[in-house]
């Protein structure tokens, strides 16, 4: 009684399809898919920026030190 079976979910799906219509549900699905894709692309760009910053910080510069002459 506490959990929903597959039949409960199918009835809910049919009711939602009748209320909103399949075209509206398709639009909602494509909008949701676009949002997920945008989120994934943003995460990949953030990871690429992090690795770029790490490689820039790890560069070494070789220099020679000179003694300062006091006059």
Swiss-Prot record:
The Tat system comprises two distinct complexes: a TatABC complex, containing multiple copies of TatA, TatB and TatC subunits, and a separate TatA complex, containing only TatA subunits. Substrates initially bind to the TatABC complex, which probably triggers association of the separate TatA complex to form the active translocon. The chain crosses the membrane at residues 1-21. Residues 48-71 are annotated as: Disordered. This is Sec-independent protein translocase protein TatA. One of its GO terms (biological process) is protein transport by the Tat complex. It is a single-pass membrane protein. Pfam families: TatA_B_E. Keywords: Cell inner membrane, Cell membrane, Membrane, Protein transport, Translocation, Transmembrane, Transmembrane helix, Transport. The keyword Hydrolase does not apply. InterPro entries: TatA/B/E, TatA/E. One of its GO terms (molecular function) is protein transmembrane transporter activity. The lineage of its organism: Bacteria, Pseudomonadati, Pseudomonadota, Betaproteobacteria, Burkholderiales.
